[in-house]
Every structure is written in C-alpha cells, then in structure tokens.
C-alpha cells in the first residue's frame, strides 16, 4: 500500500482522480524543485476549499442553532475556520505526514508550520469537493469538525489574548509580550506571523491577515499548549 492508498483508507474515501488528492498535499516549494514532473501546487484547491468549508460550516450552524443571532454565528464560524482550529483538525487526521515539500522547506520545519497545515486542510476539502461532491465533504466534517461543535467547543468565542493573560496571571505577575516576526504575500493579501512570549519563553506562534489576528492566533496556540501540558 502506497502513501496515497493509505491516506484514502485513513479518510474513508476513494478518489476517482488520485492526482487531485496528490495536488492537495503539494506545497509550492515541491513544485519549484520538481518542474520536470509537471506537478501542480495546492494553492488553487486551498482557495476553493476555504469557500467550501465556510459554506458547510455555515449551513451546519444555521440548522443546529435556529435561534442564534447572525453576529454570534459569524463569530462561531470564525473560531471554527481560524488557523489554530484548522491545524488541530489537520493533526487529528495526520495530514502532515503526507505533505510534499521541497528540501529547503522541509529543513526549515515546514511540515509542522501552522499556516502550511491549515492550508493543506483547506486544499484537501477543495479536492474532496471536486472529486466526491459536497455530500462527502459533509460526511468528512461529521467526523472531524461537527462533533466538536456539538460538544460546545465554540459556543464561547473569546478574546484569546485576554484569556491567556487571565490564565498566566492567576498566581503571579508575569510579563507577556507579542512580537510580529514578519509578513508574507502581496500587498493585497498579506499574512503576518506573530509570537507570544511569557517571561522570556516563547509559548505560541501564529499567523493572520492582520497583526491583531496574528497575535490572537499566537495566544490561542499558547493556551492550547498550557492546557495540554
């Protein structure tokens, strides 16, 4: 059994077009180093998967919470499809082991980079939608995401920076600092990377479309790390 057969068995779906599945797990760095192979990266599938994920999650929230206000549903959806949550979902189904990376990106730790894993999860959703249709996407989410919604994991949408501050300052005074590490992407579609440092120790890193979102993402990762110590 090769890795793609293993992956299909793991997710519970057979792909009619296995090349589409491979593309979902192909980072641009791999394409750059294998130009003779005529492979495609996963960026277009990520674009599609992002929209499919928003639609399916929105539909689920709309039907599950018939009395919930639009504003609250919007916040809930944002918490479900944000980068830290997508990374959690990707890790739950062991997607990182199947990602095709260039040698440089691999050495730089790309396989565990949060933004990369979140992108792979979205690109897989895009590929699954194209190959199997929306119903199979819903079936997959019923296994990976919807149970967490049912358990109430996203009912309390929070300010993660405030929550982190409350957690670490319960017993003592501590110094919490946020650093913007850099930015990537064109001017119209920038992504910022941030880290949160508590008493000199890096507790979390994250990224977002704005500096504030990146800091919130870093704080959420730090909270998850503290909770699962």
From Swiss-Prot:
Active site: 50, 122
Family (UniProt): Belongs to the ribonuclease III family.
Keywords per UniProt: Cytoplasm, Endonuclease, Hydrolase, Magnesium, Metal-binding, mRNA processing, Nuclease, RNA-binding, rRNA processing, rRNA-binding, tRNA processing
Biological process terms in GO annotation: mRNA processing; regulation of gene expression; RNA processing; rRNA processing; tRNA processing
Species of the source: Listeria monocytogenes serovar 1/2a (strain ATCC BAA-679 / EGD-e)
UniProt GO MF annotations: double-stranded RNA binding; metal ion binding; ribonuclease III activity; rRNA binding
Described function: Digests double-stranded RNA. Involved in the processing of primary rRNA transcript to yield the immediate precursors to the large and small rRNAs (23S and 16S). Processes some mRNAs, and tRNAs when they are encoded in the rRNA operon. Processes pre-crRNA and tracrRNA of type II CRISPR loci if present in the organism.
Enzyme nomenclature, EC number: 3.1.26.3
Catalytic EC class: hydrolase
GO cellular component, one term: cytosol
Entry superkingdom: Bacteria
Record's subunit section: Homodimer.
Keyword Mitochondrion appears in the UniProt entry: no
Pfam families in UniProt: dsrm, Ribonucleas_3_3
Major localisation: cytoplasm
Domain called RNase III: residue spans: 4-133
Listed name of the protein: Ribonuclease 3
Phylogenetic placement of the source organism: Bacteria, Bacillati, Bacillota, Bacilli, Bacillales
Reactions catalysed according to its record: Endonucleolytic cleavage to 5'-phosphomonoester
InterPro entries: dsRBD_dom, RNase_III, RNase_III_dom, RNase_III_sf
Domain DRBM: 159-228
Cofactor field: Mg(2+)
Record-listed Mg(2+) binding positions: 46, 119, 122
Compartment(s) where it occurs, according to its Swiss-Prot or TrEMBL record: Cytoplasm
Keyword Hydrolase: yes
């Amino acid at each position: 059994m090769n890795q793609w057969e293993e992956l299909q068995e793991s997710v519970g779906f057979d792909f009619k077009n296995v090349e589409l599945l491979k593309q979902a797990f192909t980072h641009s760095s791999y394409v750059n180093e294998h130009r003779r192979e005529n492979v495609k990266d996963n960026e277009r599938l990520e674009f599609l998967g992002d929209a499919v994920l928003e639609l399916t999650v929105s539909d689920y929230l709309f039907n599950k919470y018939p009395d919930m206000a639009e504003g609250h549903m919007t916040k809930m959806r944002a918490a479900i499809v944000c980068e830290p949550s997508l990374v959690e979902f990707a890790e739950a189904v062991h997607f990182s082991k199947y990602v095709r990376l260039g040698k440089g990106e691999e050495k730089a730790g790309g396989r565990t980079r949060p933004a990369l894993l979140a992108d792979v999860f979205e690109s897989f959703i895009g590929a699954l939608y194209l190959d199997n249709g929306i119903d199979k996407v819903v079936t997959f989410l019923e296994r990976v995401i919807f149970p967490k919604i049912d358990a109430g994991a996203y009912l309390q949408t929070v300010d993660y920076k405030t929550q982190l501050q409350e957690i670490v300052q319960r017993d003592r005074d501590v110094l919490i600092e946020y650093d913007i590490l850099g930015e990537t992407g064109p001017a119209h579609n920038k992504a910022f990377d941030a880290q949160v440092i508590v008493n000199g120790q890096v507790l979390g890193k994250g990224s977002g479309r704005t500096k504030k979102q990146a800091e919130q993402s870093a704080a959420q990762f730090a909270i998850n790390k503290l909770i699962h110590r």
